[in-house]
Structure formats: C-alpha cells, structure tokens
C-alpha cells in the first residue's frame, strides 16, 4: 500500500533513472561484465579494467529508454545480455549514472570501485 497522501509513480524508473526494470534472472549465476559498443570510450569507463565477473543477480532492464546510454552489459550463459550500467539525462535536466551492480563481492573489485568513483565524478562534472 502507498503511504497516505502519496500517489504511485509508475514511470519513475524510466523517467528518473532511465531504466526499465522487469525482473531478474535469479541467484547463483555467474555474470560477465563488459563494455557496450556505445559506452566503450565514455569517460566513466576510464581506468575500469574490463571484463570482470560478478555473482550478482542480473536484472532485466532491456530495452532502456532512448534517453539512456548503456555503458556496461552483463552476460549470463544462455540468456540475452542486459545493461548493468548506464547514463541518462532526465526530463528536468538531471544527469544520472546508474548501475544495478553492488553485490558485496563487487566492492572487493578495483574495477567496480573505479566505476563508482568515475560515475560520481561524471555526475558532478569533476
């Protein structure tokens, strides 16, 4: 139930973060993370050593809205690739960096931590 005085915002995912969440593949699958062709030269991926793997659950986010640019994709054997990191500029002009990664094991990987640092710096124009 929604809190009193609040309405449901069914398009929040697409309108604010530029996503399209529609479930996940489940736990226990190994996921390979690599750059997309459109994101390979983006500054957020500077010094991010790719590919890397994660035990994280792969979220289904395809297709992303046209305002979003996928930077990284996750690949699980026998499943379609899914975007796992992207940028978006929402309708109010806000710059968004999003990643569905964040399993506790991801934080042990220098590549993931560099991705987060770069994404934050990009959002604040540093």
Please identify what each model-predicted range represents.
Residues 1-79:
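An acidic, glycine-rich "communication" segment
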Residues 9-12, 86, 122:
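A residue-identity detector for tryptophan
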Residues 16, 77-81, 89-126:
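Extracellular ligand-binding/catalytic regions of CAZymes and related secreted enzymes
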Residues 59-60, 84-88:
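Hydrophobic/aromatic beta-strand elements that line small-molecule binding cavities or substrate pockets
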Residues 68-70, 84, 96-97:
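A broad, low-specificity signal marking well-ordered, structured residues that form hydrophobic/aromatic
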């Amino acid at each position: 139930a929604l809190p009193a005085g609040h309405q449901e915002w069914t398009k929040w995912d697409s309108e604010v973060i530029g996503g399209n969440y529609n479930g996940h593949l489940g736990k226990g699958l190994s996921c390979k993370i690599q750059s997309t062709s459109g994101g390979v030269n983006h500054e957020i991926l500077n010094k991010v050593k790719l590919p890397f793997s994660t035990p994280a659950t792969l979220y289904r986010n395809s297709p992303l809205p046209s305002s979003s640019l996928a930077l990284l994709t996750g690949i699980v054997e026998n499943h379609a690739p899914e975007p796992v990191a992207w940028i978006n500029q929402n309708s109010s002009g806000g710059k968004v960096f999003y990643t569905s990664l964040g399993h506790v094991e991801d934080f042990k990987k220098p590549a993931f931590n560099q991705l987060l640092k770069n994404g934050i710096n990009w959002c604040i124009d540093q």
